[in-house]
């Protein structure tokens, strides 16, 4: 994460390192047991729940948080993030960064997934507000926009 290195307690999770030490507040802490997906980041190209990964096991890994998606120069949102804004893909925001990171990992692997594949990928991300369907709609709107631009 931004070439940050340092000594961490052996039992510290990546989620706590990212929030407490690196002050990356886009990542949300939810259940702390890997069940809700709120703390999802992309590690070496895969979506992982950062509350289940020890920081000491991340040496040499590439980690991307929600903060790492936007354009670093302008702060402009990615097309996927903008699709969530345009389609009201979130409500309270607790689950949003985890869902977007899971979707980003899926889209990096499969640029034009079906709705069923999106739903399957998001199976580990829970939305307490009950607006999970708007997240799926936002992702599919992004996929459709990309298809139409090809």
What do these predicted ranges mean?
Residues 1-150:
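Signature of N-terminal electron-transfer/Fe-S-associated modules in redox systems
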